[in-house]
Swiss-Prot record:
SUPFAM superfamilies: Carbon-nitrogen hydrolase
Family named by the database record: Belongs to the carbon-nitrogen hydrolase superfamily. Aliphatic amidase family.
Protein name in the entry: Aliphatic amidase
Keyword Transmembrane: no
Keywords for the protein's UniProt record, in alphabetical order: Hydrolase
Gene: amiE
Purpose of the protein: Catalyzes the hydrolysis of short-chain aliphatic amides to their corresponding organic acids with release of ammonia.
Annotated HAMAP family: Aliphatic_amidase
Organism: Pseudomonas fluorescens (strain SBW25)
Enzyme Commission number, as recorded: 3.5.1.4
Pfam family name, one: CN_hydrolase
A molecular function (GO) term: amidase activity
Length: 347
């Protein structure tokens, strides 16, 4: 894995991430116009970065955040649809793969259910090869319908790719799920705003290290009239070290080459920090010395995970005992979310 050049090679996947300026849009026509601008950017980037095999745009980069519910429902997209057709054409023209945000994607029961927050991975032939729906929306603010699974597919040059979105990345479980399915590159598209810049930068680096995987983060930049977005799109090596990172600038771009052979060699041959292997072979050194086989322990030692899988309702009740029993909070109500107390006023 290396950083600083504009090339790629048969062994390296050239990955670019974009600090896309958060748009503020209100209509389908504006969304289509913005999608066309993104398509133009892809073609231009390929000219400047001829080795680019994959370009990643942030969450909300296509549609912005529709703070008006009616606008959100009216602009919700179908997949495939007008937006993905524009992106597919750009990927074919530039001979590159791309990750694009659709906020939202129409629910199967549209308009009776909230839309999904969705990413699509499109290959250089213009084909949609992965569609991921955000599993853990940023409640209480985001009103998206949650997805229910992660995916892994072959990306450029055979690199295994998973997609996750923004707040998903605050939960180690989703990273581990992707990695244990074989993901070598986890793409995290964000529309993350201040004040949580330091925490989000740290999280992506830590998860790359903990899961022996590459991470590509694309985050929004700028101000949309409500939130200020901190950028810092980055490409991180499977050892948790940053290869390239943008600042807070609008439309900043970072680029790095990710070796396919290096990550596979590390996963096969690294020992003390091979976290994926060691998690399912716990204590193999001591057990082998004790005459108890050469595989270590595979059983899950974590009671929480066993409970969650076997009795999700009980797991939910258990977490409410150490947090709260209502989704809303009386001291800081959001929308019409139910809470158990009387709203307090400042002063």
């Amino acid at each position: 894995m290396r950083h600083g050049d504009i090339s790629s090679s048969p062994d390296t996947v050239g990955v670019a991430v974009v600090n896309y300026k958060m748009p503020r849009l209100h209509s389908k026509a504006e969304v289509i116009d913005n999608a066309s601008k993104i398509a133009e950017i892809i073609v231009g980037m390929k000219q400047g970065l001829p080795g680019m095999d994959l370009v990643v745009f942030p969450e909300y980069s296509t549609m912005g955040i529709m703070y008006d519910h009616d606008e959100m429902m009216a602009t919700a997209a179908s997949i495939p649809g007008e937006e993905t057709a524009i992106f597919s054409a750009a990927c074919r023209q530039a001979n590159t793969w791309g990750v694009f945000s659709l906020t939202g994607e129409r629910h199967e029961a549209h308009p009776h259910k909230a839309p999904y927050n969705t990413l699509v991975l499109i290959n250089n032939l213009g084909e949609i090869v992965q569609r991921y729906r955000k599993c853990i929306p940023w409640c209480p603010i985001e009103g998206w319908y949650p997805g229910d699974r992660t995916y892994v597919c072959d990306g450029p040059k055979g690199m295994k790719i998973s997609l996750i979105i923004c707040d998903d990345g605050n939960y180690p479980e989703i990273w581990r799920d992707c990695a244990m399915k074989g993901a070598e590159l986890i793409v995290r598209c964000q529309g993350y705003m201040y004040p949580a810049k330091e925490q989000q930068v740290q999280m992506s680096k830590s998860m790359a290290w903990a899961n022996n995987c590459y991470v590509a983060v694309a985050n929004a930049a700028g101000f949309d009239g409500v939130y200020s977005y901190f950028g810092h799109s980055a490409i991180i090596g499977f050892d948790g070290r940053t290869l390239g990172e943008c600042g807070e600038e609008e439309m900043g771009i970072q680029y790095a080459q990710l070796s396919v052979s290096q990550i596979r060699d590390a996963r096969a041959n690294d020992q003390s920090q091979n976290h994926l292997f060691k998690l399912l072979h716990r204590g193999y050194t001591g057990m082998h010395a004790s005459g108890d086989g050469d595989k270590g322990v595979a059983d899950c030692p974590f009671e929480f995970y066993r409970t969650w899988v076997l009795d999700a309702q009980k797991a939910q009740e258990n977490v409410e005992k150490i947090t709260r029993s209502t989704v809303g909070v009386a001291e800081c109500p959001v929308g019409n979310l139910p809470h158990g107390g009387k709203e307090q006023t400042a002063g």
